[in-house]
Amino acid sequence: MDSKFFKSLSLAASVICLVTSCSKKLDEAYQNPNAAVRQPVENIFPSLVGSFSGSASSAGSSYGNGGDGLLVGRYIQYWNNYTLTNTDNGGTQYDQMGGTIGGSDNLGSLWGAFYYGQGQNLNKVIQWGSEEQKWDYVGGALAIRAWGWLELANEYGDAIVVKQAFNTNLSQFAYDPQSLAYDSCRAAAYKALTYLGMTGGAVSQGNFAVGDAYFYKGDVNKWKKFVYGILARSFASLTNKAAYSADSVIKYCNLA
């Protein structure tokens, strides 16, 4: 009887341990053995700037404007490339008589740069930068997010994920209208200007330049001009809409 009792008790304890151990998420239970879970925002920020044109990582490379710019140039017939056969030539053209079919990721580089290359990395700069009162980094990250929304809206039209963006609990996402991306662009831009104007906490041009060594070297005034340029472009993109505001275009062009 004692043996059965202790076996039952042991089984119950094992079940309890199993249930409680499963309460942790996978990334909490098994920490990254190769790097600290939390990295300095100064180390993350350079990759956000680099992904303007291109990036490289183990899970995907060449995300940014560079790759898509090459293909857009073919689409608007700025240039083309010619190989030995007509079949190969047709695969490099973007018009009624040619184009990319099948499983190609052509014209997906900007998408990858925004949602993957910047994505959660940019979110962490905003989160950790706020916790550390590095408002210049927060403002810079929001400026890059505004740039991304604008570029996505211009390139992909209504095929953009806005409301569900960066939701790690989803594996399928719903597209949103282009206008929502423009609205999100401006919202991020206005927030960026607010943070770039803050001087308290751990704000320091010297420290901001550590992560911003190759863009504006930590100069928040240049970052503000960058944001004003984004706002001007966002309003200029609506020239064929009833909501077009020429005054806003002129205002932000003068500030940029």
Set out the residue ranges of the language-model regions.
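Structured, solvent-exposed acidic/aromatic patches
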Residues: 38-42, 81-256
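Generic surface-pattern signal
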Residues: 11, 50-57, 127, 194-197
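Long, intrinsically disordered, low-complexity segments
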Residues: 2, 19-23, 219-220, 233
